[in-house]
Amino acid sequence: QKLCERPSGTWSGVCGNNNACKN
């Protein structure tokens, strides 16, 4: 799984099958 990038520029959570960010 790869990290998700938030609009603020920080990385948090993981990307699911639909690239959805889960905190």
Swiss-Prot record:
GO terms for biological process: defense response to fungus; killing of cells of another organism. The modification Pyrrolidone carboxylic acid is found at residue 1. SUPFAM superfamilies: Scorpion toxin-like. The keyword RNA-binding does not apply. The keyword Transmembrane helix does not apply. Keywords: Antimicrobial, Fungicide, Plant defense, Pyrrolidone carboxylic acid. Belongs to the DEFL family. Forms oligomers in its native state. Possesses antifungal activity sensitive to inorganic cations. This is Defensin-like protein 2. It comes from Brassica napus (Rape).
